[in-house]
């Protein structure tokens, strides 16, 4: 007998297939995933790739350009005009879509906090009074800090990139385990895929990512805004 379970999260999907016996004609359900096709333009792209050994360390951010077949690094165009976090229509129309916005995720965090305050026993870590969600975002004056839980994934399984104005986070992990007897085996498959719309007032080529103990931390610095002070004469 084979079973398939599908659970969704802000990082889309976590699919596992296991407990398959050879008595069932060796039929195994293939892993499934939920996704929405995205439109990609061949423009400037920033890629954060995991490098080094298997230890969880910081992820180096590499800057490359895909225009005209030129692989030389180019400056990222910054137009600090769109200060608000845009809403992606795909994330609004399809609740299972991997395309999200930071505004949507922050609103979701606020709703979870309100629900927990209304029902004190809900969504709290055992033994503590703190709320623990699979992701967290803090937006302040200088930077945007993000946290995503990716249990079971190493930095070799995770890829963070910036495509145009989208922050793309992908993770994939496949593992096969032997069963307790010779007639059964299991397969675990974890997949994460989300896209967040970035505002214009961030420094895209200075985004940093770090993976520690299955938790991904992303730091997005903001551009410095000159404050112009005008004295008003009092008559």
Swiss-Prot record:
Any one cellular-component term (Gene Ontology): chloroplast
Keywords: Chloroplast, Plastid, Stress response, Transit peptide
SUPFAM superfamilies: HSP20-like chaperones
InterPro entries listed in its UniProt record: A-crystallin/Hsp20_dom, HSP20-like_chaperone, HSP21-like
Gene3D superfamilies reported for this sequence: 2.60.40.790
Inducers of expression: By high temperature but not by drought or anaerobic conditions.
Tissues of expression: In fruits, flowers, leaves, and stems.
Short name of any one Pfam family annotated for the protein: HSP20
Residue span, sHSP domain: 126-235
GO BP annotations listed: response to heat
Basic and acidic residues composition bias: residue spans: 52-63
TM spans (from-to): none
Region annotation Disordered: where it falls in the sequence: 1-23, 51-80
Intracellular or extracellular location(s): Plastid, Chloroplast
Composition-biased stretches (Polar residues): 64-74
Domain of life: Eukaryota
Recorded family membership: Belongs to the small heat shock protein (HSP20) family.
Protein name per its UniProtKB record: Small heat shock protein, chloroplastic
Lineage: Eukaryota, Viridiplantae, Streptophyta, Embryophyta, Tracheophyta
